[in-house]
Amino acid sequence: HPINIHQVLDRVKALAANGVADGLILTDDYDPSLPPAYGDEDQLIQIFLNLVKNAAEAAHARGDGRGAITIHTAYRHGVKVRAAKGHVLRGAPLEVRIQDNGPGVPAHLRESLFQPFVSTKTHGAGLGLALVAKLVAGHGGLIDFESEPGRTTFRVLLPIASGEDTPA
């Protein structure tokens, strides 16, 4: 279905602001010209709420009351994702970046961060990012991240809702 990604992200922000992101600076930097995304709204909310929840936990870990999360959107021309079936390259130009100013992902976890049972937390099963990666792939998208002390950014690339770019 065609989905307004900004409506999804605004719902995620509202849910997070009253919960995990309480006490954090939560801002957005949206590209107003984005076309609709292709996808399942509930799954997209699940994807981004999980990423914002992780970002909030990282930002709170600063312990100085200055934790912040920024949600960016952009259109990236020419980004292609290889589809599993038939190895067709599919456009995934919608970019959503969720950035926090927490301590960063420990180096020893970076290679396996999207695997099940890998976690930076002492509590929890470590299934969050594995599920996020599976849901993103199911949408014909891509997820990656960059991390350094003081900043981690998760980037999700999604297809737009048009005949040629929607997964079969």
What are these regions (language model features)?
Residues L89-P93, V105-P116:
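Short conserved segment of the HATPase_c
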